[in-house]
């Protein structure tokens, strides 16, 4: 089979022919329909400082946002059968640590990531734990299924710990409208937010945010986001702030435009320490600060399925580019250009379910 491989600890990747892997006990072999490019994949492709410190096995096949058809099942697999169309949860949990045993497998102490710690999905076939294969029902386009994993990140951040009830009829601010931020705009709109405010310096992504349902678009290059949000909310601020950028200045602004008693979900990863006014902007506000990683397994997947299968969120505008796998260099260049949102690649000739 063809697979995109990180063949050496240096920038770039190679398209190679490698054997089709066999599923072991508790595993399934998935014939990949589509895989989308994530920021993690860009790091690995560029072989930046993060990748050098995180990726421990080279050569390897990378890529982790994926959907496809189960081609074969290993021993002791009972809940998923050959021919099922699945999306894949990329957090591979141990199942036995204290966090797994208390229902928080997405923050497993021994967590492994598909396409980082194991061979991934930029290939014609990929082996994954059967428990990580989420059966995609009718009503979800196969291409959309390939981005259910990052869409789930946005679902987790937007729903928070209260099932999204704090969004209903309230103003919501999304800071950073990359793909996950754009997804969050659509989710907040679907959950009944009174006003969805998108804060994003990139002109094209602000336009996409409007297509996803944003009511107010703020360019932080020309307008003060704190003043703009306070003006739009009668001085109250946003009841929910979804911070997707990881930018230190934006995170600080997020606490300042957050309403008293409001909730701020942090998903964007800053490059280093961030300075915040904890006294006035967090403690005295009784702000709820919620760190977000991955997806709750598998509550988030059910929420994701409902939003997509019912059409409550249309993610078509976010998928801006499609490439066959043999044009991977162009695909990665496009994903890193700032002129794309979600880029998906197709390893096989047949792009239909």
What is the predicted role of each segment?
Residues 1, 31, 240, 252-256, ...:
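C-terminal hydrophobic helical "lid"/dimerization subdomain
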Residues 138-222, 227:
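Mid-domain Rossmann-like dinucleotide-binding core that forms the NAD(H)/NADP(H) cofactor-binding site
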Residues 215, 247-310, 347-353:
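Glycine-rich phosphate-binding loop and adjacent beta-alpha segment
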Residues 236-242:
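Short SAM/SAH-binding signature in class I
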């Amino acid at each position: 089979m063809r697979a995109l491989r990180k063949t050496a600890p240096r920038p770039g990747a190679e398209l190679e022919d490698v054997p089709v892997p066999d599923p072991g006990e508790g595993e399934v072999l998935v014939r990949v329909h589509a895989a989308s490019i994530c920021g993690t994949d860009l790091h690995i492709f560029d072989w930046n400082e993060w990748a050098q410190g995180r990726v421990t096995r080279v050569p390897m096949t990378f890529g982790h946002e994926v959907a496809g058809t189960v081609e074969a099942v290993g021993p002791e697999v009972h809940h998923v059968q050959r021919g099922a169309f699945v999306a894949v949860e990329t957090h591979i949990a141990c199942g036995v640590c204290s966090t797994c045993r208390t229902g928080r497998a997405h923050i497993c102490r021994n967590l492994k990531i598909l396409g980082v710690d194991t061979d991934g999905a930029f290939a014609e076939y990929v082996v994954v734990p059967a428990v990580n294969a989420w059966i995609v029902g009718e009503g979800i386009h196969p291409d959309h299924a390939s981005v259910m994993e990052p869409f789930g990140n946005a679902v987790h951040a937007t729903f928070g710990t209260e099932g999204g009830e704090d969004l209903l009829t309230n103003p919501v601010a999304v800071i950073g409208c990359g793909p996950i931020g754009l997804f969050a705009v659509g989710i907040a709109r679907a959950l009944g937010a009174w006003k969805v405010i998108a804060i994003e310096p990139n002109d094209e992504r602000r336009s996409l945010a409007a297509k996803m349902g944003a009511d107010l678009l703020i360019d932080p290059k020309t307008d003060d986001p704190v003043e703009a949000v306070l003006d739009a909310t009668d001085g109250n601020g946003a009841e929910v702030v979804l911070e997707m950028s990881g930018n230190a200045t934006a995170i600080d602004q997020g606490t300042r435009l957050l309403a008293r008693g409001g909730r701020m979900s942090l998903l964007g990863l800053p490059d280093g320490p961030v300075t915040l006014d904890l006294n006035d902007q967090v403690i005295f506000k009784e702000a709820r600060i919620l760190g977000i990683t991955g997806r709750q397994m598998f509550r988030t997947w059910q929420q994701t399925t409902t939003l997509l299968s019912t059409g409550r969120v249309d993610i078509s505008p976010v998928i801006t580019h499609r490439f066959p796998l043999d044009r991977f260099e162009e695909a990665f260049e496009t994903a890193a250009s700032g002129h794309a949102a979600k880029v998906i690649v197709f390893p096989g000739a047949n792009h239909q379910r």
